[in-house]
Amino acid sequence: MDLETLNKIQEVEKDTGQSVLSIYSKVPFGNVVTAFREIPVSDLVDMVKSVPITKLVEGLQIITPNEISQIEVKKLKIVLKYGDMNNVAKLQEKFSERSIIIAISKISYRRLQELLERNNLDVMIDAINRNAFLNN
């Protein structure tokens, strides 16, 4: 891990009062490093403050490094905050990460939050199918 990543970790811990180093033992190393490299400190702080650590850990276990680096940070925060991680995992099993990245990039913030709050797996599958595979 490089010095810049360590400094970001320390800054997030200072700003949130929570230890994020505990995440390392529970989350694939590449996911954590990618998150700290790709996501600005202010957004990391917001994630740690707005998403329970257990849910954040679960989300970082499921979401891939490519998704972390390619999904817009605001949408990634929506997924972590409003998503049922069991359904997120099921979507990961059904679709390629590329399909998920494309679909999420096409869905508006509001629609993404609505889909996640509704928490209906079939509706989410339909949304990914419509957005990832059609030229719209």
Model-identified regions with their sequence ranges:
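General marker for long, soluble alpha-helical cores
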Residues: 1-136
